UniProtKB/Swiss-Prot annotation:
Heterodimer of an alpha subunit and a beta subunit. PSII is composed of 1 copy each of membrane proteins PsbA, PsbB, PsbC, PsbD, PsbE, PsbF, PsbH, PsbI, PsbJ, PsbK, PsbL, PsbM, PsbT, PsbX, PsbY, PsbZ, Psb30/Ycf12, peripheral proteins PsbO, CyanoQ (PsbQ), PsbU, PsbV and a large number of cofactors. It forms dimeric complexes. Part of a photosystem II (PSII) assembly intermediate complex PSII-I; crystallized from a strain deleted of psbJ, it forms monomeric PSII before addition of the oxygen evolving complex. PSII-I includes 3 assembly factors not found in mature PSII (Psb27, Psb28 and Psb34). Residues 40-84 are lumenal. It is a single-pass membrane protein. This is Cytochrome b559 subunit alpha. This b-type cytochrome is tightly associated with the reaction center of photosystem II (PSII). PSII is a light-driven water:plastoquinone oxidoreductase that uses light energy to abstract electrons from H(2)O, generating O(2) and a proton gradient subsequently used for ATP formation. It consists of a core antenna complex that captures photons, and an electron transfer chain that converts photonic excitation into a charge separation. Heme binds at H23. The gene is psbE. With its partner (PsbF) binds heme. PSII binds additional chlorophylls, carotenoids and specific lipids.
Amino acid sequence: MAGTTGERPFSDIITSVRYWVIHSITIPALFIAGWLFVSTGLAYDVFGTPRPDSYYAQEQRSIPLVTDRFEAKQQVETFLEQLK
């Protein structure tokens, strides 16, 4: 036999005016806070990830791509030398 936990049913919660008054403010506020966190660049500083313009050195603006599988080791060594 099923008992009751004493909690309000979910259908009562989402149909209440109080729920929508609270959430009509908090949901957009969280969205705006997240947007500001990312758009101001604070997310890069907090998590320590490089900004999009600093992934590569100034001289190298392309992805270091290995094109020949038989000379892969030589190409990787060349890429690493360019970083120094």
